[in-house]
Amino acid sequence: MARRRKRGYYLVEGLDLHEEMERLRALPIFAGGELARRRPELRVRRPSKKPNRVGFAIPGEWRISVTAYPGIRAGDAQEILLHELVHLHVGELPGAHRWHGRGFRLALHRAMVEAYGLEVPRPRSIHHGYYAEAIERARGPEQLELAVAA
């Protein structure tokens, strides 16, 4: 069983990634699979600048990593987290595109629809940002809270 760290470790832009991971593991797409039965270890990296690699999964160690880079939004973190969970679920597939091939892309799209209710076409590319933008749009504009004058 993966270790639980202090709450602040998982907090990214107001989102507790550990709690979000637990919610995502209960999605119908993962039902009956290893991910529904066994919690992976979640690590959060916090570099000083945005890296080329914003997350990764190591299926053999049942571990994922999400990078909380400067300027990350909650939608970015959600996209990265679910992307890496889908890697654990799907694993390495045969063929030339064993990690990001058609099977992975179909599973990722289904997971995004189930998790966030997104009504977007499947993207042609697997590059980070497409689903994050849709999640942020679905969240809506941030509401300002103004004090009431007495």
Where does each model-flagged region fall?
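Active-site recognition of the HExxH zinc-binding catalytic motif
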Residues: E79-E92
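Metalloprotease/metallohydrolase-associated module, dominated by Zn2+-dependent proteases
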Residues: A2-G75, E92-A150
